[in-house]
A protein has these predicted regions:
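Structural motif
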Residues: 82-93, 137-145
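Beta-strand-rich domains and repeat architectures in extracellular enzymes and scaffolds
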Residues: 55-78
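Hydrophobic/aromatic beta-strand elements that line small-molecule binding cavities or substrate pockets
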Residues: 63-65, 91-95, 118-121, 142-144
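Beta-propeller domains
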Residues: 34-52, 84-103
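Short aromatic loop motif centered on NTY/YTY
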Residues: 103-154
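Short beta-strand elements that form the blades of beta-propeller/WD-repeat-like
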Residues: 70-86, 122-135
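A short, amphipathic edge element
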Residues: 53-61, 87-88, 112-115
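Terminal domain-start segments
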Residues: 1-60
Length: 154
């Protein structure tokens, strides 16, 4: 497959590859809090070596990832922060998985908090992911369209 070795290690830690169609709810997302991503890899890739953050503060947990093998694009779904957070915001990043280079990202696309706010992620295809959040009796839906080059449109 010709993947950057360090980026491949990140993908292994992200868990099994998701295949569309796939539906993931808050309960499954919460289970990921039990398995954090290595802080060195999280700092380098998911936090993009943020100058305002120390490596030992780079907490991340995986929701999953997709690989569009036709265009060498990896789509990562995760949340940043400690597992004990009160609210979890979902971030999405796209990478060229052969080089490990970031293509695009969107932070805080959806969120959940125990029983007070629930989220559902529906992966229709490699190019369309729908997030539905229900909080305080209101439903919010966000559709992400991801081009074959990895660009994210909301």
């Amino acid at each position: 497959m010709g993947v950057n070795d360090e980026f491949m290690e990140l993908l292994i830690q992200m868990g099994p590859e998701m295949k569309p169609p796939k539906n993931i709810g808050s309960y499954v997302m919460e289970q990921a809090l039990e398995v954090p991503i290595d802080q060195k890899l999280a700092f380098k890739y998911l936090w993009q070596s943020n100058e305002y953050l120390k490596e030992e503060e780079a907490f991340c947990n995986s929701i999953g990832f997709l690989l569009n093998k036709e265009s060498s694009v990896a789509i990562l779904f995760f949340y940043k922060g400690q597992a004990e957070s009160l609210f979890y915001l979902i971030d999405v990043q796209t990478y060229n998985y052969k080089t490990g280079k970031l293509i695009d990202e969107i932070n805080g696309v959806a969120g959940f908090k125990g029983d007070d706010a629930v989220c559902n992620m529906q992966v229709n295809s490699y190019n369309e992911i729908v997030f539905k959040t229900l909080a305080a009796g209101q439903t919010n839906e966000i559709v992400l369209n991801i081009s074959n080059k990895g660009k994210i449109q909301r």
